[in-house]
């Protein structure tokens, strides 16, 4: 089964919440379990203001890997971010990592990157050099 959906969410955590919230409260735990068992990938993207005046695309990729189903089932967003960082070589990436790449290559400003970051406290530590 192939399911492709376009949802009004900006990252994997909001996507998981959005899907879960479609179900009645009493059914959400079961919905999370089904989602955890079936999800193969969640791709998110957002457009950032580019220093050149246009837009720069920022991507987030969550792929099925060891630990992902359990973290989804338990709604453990921090664990999912750690998994994404650990599996970067396999193509996963957090939104904040993509923002750091765009900033490091001069495609977006530090203020734009910070405004779009999902973990502002952690991102602020990265911005010290900018």
Predicted regions mapped to residue ranges:
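Short, flexible helix-loop junctions that flank or precede catalytic/ligand sites
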Residues: 1-130
